[in-house]
């Protein structure tokens, strides 16, 4: 190659813009370029060529003319101009500027020396050759090579420094990148820890909130269950109280109904007795053996009032006494006497007549013992005024009654005197304001005895009293007819306690039960103490004209029917209680 590079430098090539009065980068883009000074050995010319380091774009290519003015404006910025424009080189270092400036000076010296050299031979062609002053061509070549070598070394050193700088920059960038990554990692870890801590706190708070809410709900549920249980217990207690109150009211209503019927039956009892008395007292001239014969079957009704049935509890309805109960051997405590009877339809009995002149007036008998009821169910209807004697008091009263009867038997052997004594005793007993109603037993016997004595006295007085007696018999005939019809034709469709006794509109079976024994008690009342207490083991076996045995069978059936009804009611009540308990249990289970 005819051209050789005598120098290279790293510099930014600039061109001066005359229009804008400023330096602009050559090639339109900034950046360093490799600037060489080439020497054409054949022509002995020099030129400056610059290429971009990045894309090898030629940014400068100008010849170095002879007489060029090279201006070193600063240590790193040199400039020159040719006929077209002004060039400037902004070197990267002082070494590059010095190397390029030395090569430029050497090129200018060569060009200047070449201009003066040929002219001298032409001018002095006739003169001998002279010794050239200055370095020879070989020396210049050696210097040029040395400069190139230095330039090359500097270039290598510069490249090495550039590589080191770039390596340092790369390491610095990597370090910064690592630091950035480490910092980001730490920040990420910190954020992650904070997030986890926040989530843990939120989870703990949520769990605590849920636990607190569950505790509150459990407490509310327990409170609600306790309130419901208390409310249920209160409702059950109110329901039990209501049922108890209704049961008590039902019992009171039944007791009042039974009491009302008993009062009606007790009030109708004297009217039902008048007719059998008329039939018994129709023949006033009855003989003494006839009375003795009638005393035998009348002993059982007299014991009926003394031997009592067992005392039953107040809730069930009372069982009416019958002949079957009269033969019970165990005497229970006596019940309360019934209230005084309502006035009967017949005329009131007249006062007892004065004693006859040929008779010794009997001593006043003591008040008889209160009559014993045939059943213990009268206990619920007794009052404070007519409370009966029980226990030892009843036994003492019975003993007094026996003593008086014995005295009457010894002092007054005649039947008329006994009748008078019994009449006075009956008057004394019935005249008491708080005396019990004679329903059965000795009280019923005393009532019958009083009626018999009154009939006897009326028969002894004369015809005027006999007319009154006939009127009384006429008035008493109607109840006998109604009673006979009711006893002879019982209603098969009704139960025994529902059969209607048409006398005075009452429906009590007590009146019809007592009619037959009273007829026998009237005849039996005049007998002695021994005949009163004669033991009888069996009731009447022969059916009488009044139908005693038939009534006994009716009242046995009545007793059985009442027991059956009581069992049915108790079973029904038990089922209702069981159903109510089941309903409450089902409510509590569903709640």
UniProtKB/Swiss-Prot annotation:
GO terms for molecular function: actin binding; profilin binding; SH3 domain binding; WW domain binding. It is found in: Cytoplasm; Cytoplasm, Cytoskeleton; Cell projection, Lamellipodium; Cell projection, Filopodium. GO terms for cellular component: cytoskeleton; cytosol; filopodium; focal adhesion; GABA-ergic synapse; lamellipodium; plasma membrane; postsynapse. NTN1-induced PKA phosphorylation on Ser-265 directly parallels the formation of filopodial protrusions. Residues 135-265, 557-587 form a coiled coil. The gene is ENAH. Residues 156-200 are annotated as: 9 X 5 AA tandem repeats of [LMQ]-E-[QR]-E-[QR]. The keyword Cytoplasm applies. GO terms for biological process: actin polymerization or depolymerization; actin polymerization-dependent cell motility; axon guidance; postsynaptic cytoskeleton organization. It comes from Homo sapiens. Expressed in myoepithelia of parotid, breast, bronchial glands and sweat glands. Expressed in colon-rectum muscolaris mucosae epithelium, pancreas acinar ductal epithelium, endometrium epithelium, prostate fibromuscolar stroma and placenta vascular media. Overexpressed in a majority of breast cancer cell lines and primary breast tumor lesions. A motif (KLKR) lies at residues 400-403. Residues 554-588 are annotated as: EVH2 block C. Homotetramer. Interacts with APBB1IP, APBB1, PFN1 and ROBO4. Isoforms, containing the polyproline-rich regions with PPLP motifs, bind the WW domain of APBB1IP. Isoforms, containing the PPSY motif, bind, in vitro, to the WW2 and WW3 domains of NEDD4 and to the WW1 domain of YAP1. Binds the SH3 domain of BAIAP2-alpha but only after the autoinhibitory region of BAIAP2-alpha has been blocked by interaction with CDC42. Interacts, via the EVH1/WH1 domain, with the Pro-rich domains from VCL, ZYX and Listeria monocytogenes actA and with TES (via LIM domains). Residues 221-264 have a biased composition (Basic and acidic residues). It comes from the Eukaryota. Residues 442-459 are annotated as: EVH2 block B. This is Protein enabled homolog. Residues 115-136, 275-305, 479-491, 499-509, 538-549 have a biased composition (Polar residues). The keyword Lyase does not apply. InterPro entries: PH-like_dom_sf, VASP_sf, VASP_tetra, WH1/EVH1_dom. Residues 115-146, 221-379, 405-549 are annotated as: Disordered. Keywords: Actin-binding, Cell junction, Cell projection, Coiled coil, Cytoplasm, Cytoskeleton, Phosphoprotein, Repeat, SH3-binding, Synapse. Residues 432-443 have a biased composition (Gly residues). Residues 311-323, 330-373 have a biased composition (Pro residues). The lineage of its organism: Eukaryota, Metazoa, Chordata, Craniata, Vertebrata. Sequence repeats lie at residues 156-160, 161-165, 166-170, 171-175, 176-180, 181-185, 186-190, 191-195, 196-200. The EVH2 domain is comprised of 3 regions. Block A is a thymosin-like domain required for G-actin binding. The KLKR motif within this block is essential for the G-actin binding and for actin polymerization. Block B is required for F-actin binding and subcellular location, and Block C for tetramerization.
């Amino acid at each position: 190659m005819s051209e050789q590079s005598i120098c290279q430098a790293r510099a930014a090539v600039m061109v001066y813009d005359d229009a804008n009065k400023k330096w602009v980068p050559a090639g339109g883009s900034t950046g360093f370029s490799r600037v060489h000074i080439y020497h054409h050995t054949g022509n002995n010319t020099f030129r400056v060529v610059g290429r971009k380091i990045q894309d090898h774009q030629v940014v400068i290519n100008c010849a170095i003319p002879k007489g060029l003015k090279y201006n070193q404006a600063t240590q790193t910025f040199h400039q020159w101009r040719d006929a077209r424009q002004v060039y400037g080189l902004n070197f990267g270092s002082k070494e590059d500027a010095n190397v390029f400036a030395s090569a430029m000076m050497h090129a200018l010296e060569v060009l200047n020396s070449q201009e003066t050299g040929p002219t001298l031979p032409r001018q002095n062609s006739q003169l001998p050759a002279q010794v050239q002053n200055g370095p020879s061509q070989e020396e210049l070549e050696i210097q040029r090579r040395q400069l190139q070598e230095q330039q090359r070394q500097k270039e290598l050193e510069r490249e090495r420094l550039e590589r080191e700088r770039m390596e340092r920059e790369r390491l610095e960038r990597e370090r910064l990148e690592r630091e950035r990554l480490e910092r980001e990692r730490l920040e990420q870890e910190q954020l992650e820890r904070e997030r986890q801590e926040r989530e843990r706190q939120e989870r703990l708070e949520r769990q605590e909130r849920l636990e607190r809410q569950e505790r509150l709900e459990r407490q509310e549920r327990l409170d609600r269950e306790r309130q419901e249980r208390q409310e249920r217990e209160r409702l059950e207690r109110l329901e039990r109280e209501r049922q108890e109150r209704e049961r008590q009211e039902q019992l009171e209503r039944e007791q009042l109904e039974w009491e009302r019927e008993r009062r009606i039956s007790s009030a109708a009892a004297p009217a039902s007795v008048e007719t059998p008395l008329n039939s018994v007292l129709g023949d006033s001239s009855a003989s003494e053996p006839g009375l003795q014969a009638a005393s035998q079957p009348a002993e059982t009704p007299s014991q009926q009032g003394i031997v009592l049935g067992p005392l039953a509890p107040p809730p069930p309805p009372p069982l009416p006494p019958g002949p079957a109960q009269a033969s019970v051997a165990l005497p229970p405590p006596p019940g309360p006497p019934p209230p005084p009877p309502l006035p009967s339809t017949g005329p009131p009995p007249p006062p007892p007549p004065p004693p006859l002149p040929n008779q010794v007036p009997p001593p006043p008998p003591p008040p008889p013992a209160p009559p014993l009821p045939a059943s213990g169910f009268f206990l619920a209807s007794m009052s404070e005024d007519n409370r009966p004697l029980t226990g030892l008091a009843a036994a003492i009263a019975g003993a007094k009654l026996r003593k008086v009867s014995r005295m009457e038997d010894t002092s007054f052997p005649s039947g008329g005197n006994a009748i008078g004594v019994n009449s006075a005793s009956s008057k004394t007993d019935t005249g008491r304001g708080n005396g019990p109603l004679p329903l059965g037993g000795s009280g019923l016997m005393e009532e019958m005895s009083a009626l018999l004595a009154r009939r006897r006295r009326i028969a002894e007085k004369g015809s005027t009293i006999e007319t009154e007696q006939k009127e009384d018999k006429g008035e008493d005939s109607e109840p006998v007819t109604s009673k006979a019809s009711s006893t002879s034709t019982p209603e098969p469709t009704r139960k025994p306690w529902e059969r209607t006794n048409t006398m005075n509109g009452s429906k009590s079976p007590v009146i019809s039960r007592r009619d037959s024994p009273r007829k026998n008690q009237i005849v039996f009342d005049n007998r002695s103490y021994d005949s009163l207490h004669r033991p009888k083991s069996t009731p009447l076996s022969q059916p009488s004209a009044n139908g005693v045995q038939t009534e006994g069978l009716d009242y046995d059936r009545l007793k059985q029917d009442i027991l059956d009804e009581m069992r049915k009611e108790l079973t029904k009540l038990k089922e209702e209680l069981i159903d109510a308990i089941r309903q409450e249990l089902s409510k509590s289970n569903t709640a």
